[in-house]
């Protein structure tokens, strides 16, 4: 393991440098920089801790082998330590493997109703609530940037910004990046008088929001900016002035809305940040053709034929069609209990990456 050891030497030095930097009050006068350093330190701390455990286990194994040469009672202990060393070695190798560069990032998530009329809008609202509950379970913050509601209180569309708190090694993107695509629901709609099960669909688009948006140039002449009076669920006013902002990026057709900041200027600034993140994601997809299918085609059309997951109410079943995952706890899933599903998706993604490498 010569190469990983060399890598570890570099990471140990970086870990020590960050530890000193984070102890300096001067750094914390720059909150964004301190947060970025804290996240990096948290990830390195896991690697360093595993490496130190591996070093200690190897030393114990060497001692056990020496003792076993003259005392058979140490043979079993040596075997246990060999298994421990192999386990830690595997963990460290996994930690040192190339990672998605956005794993520590926050996200912007869009939910859009599709076919199914009012029922689709109600299902889109169920999905938005599911993600909000999941974020709450993890102590993350959720901001509703914009929403268009239906007559029965569903979502025609909604845009959420989800951000982790504190210094975490893995951010929101690492857990929620597989949610983009078409979600299908099978249930009896509230508008159905005959008790028949209907199928509807809603689409989800999710993309990372890096702390620093790269070299994305946005020409003001490519933008159409509209100002309007926003309204939230149930028609209640969110703003007392026409402060909501809708920005359309004409070359791509991307539309970003923001209505929940305190002023029109703040809404425009936030909408531009989201637009920049969206355009950066598109640029990265084009630069990485092999990976582009993962996100670029998340919502080509919100149609039942392009589904990633089905929520079947009569059978209390959730099925993720990409990995064949099934569970019969639909009510818990819709209440934000998504970790088992997300773990399965991450494991499948990891296996696919290993097969491609």
Curated annotation (Swiss-Prot):
Residue positions, PTM N5-methylglutamine: 236
Record GO cellular component, one term: cytoplasm
Modifications the protein undergoes after translation, according to the UniProt entry: Methylated by PrmC. Methylation increases the termination efficiency of RF1.
Top-rank lineage group of the source organism: Bacteria
Signal peptide positions on this chain: none
Alphabetical keyword list: Cytoplasm, Methylation, Protein biosynthesis
Alphabetized GO MF terms: translation release factor activity, codon specific
Main location class: cytoplasm
Location in the cell: Cytoplasm
Presence of the UniProt keyword Membrane in the record: no
Function description: Peptide chain release factor 1 directs the termination of translation in response to the peptide chain termination codons UAG and UAA.
NCBIfam families for the chain: prfA, PRK00591.1
UniProt record similarity statement: Belongs to the prokaryotic/mitochondrial release factor family.
Entry-linked HAMAP family: Rel_fac_1
Protein name listed in UniProt: Peptide chain release factor 1
Gene: prfA
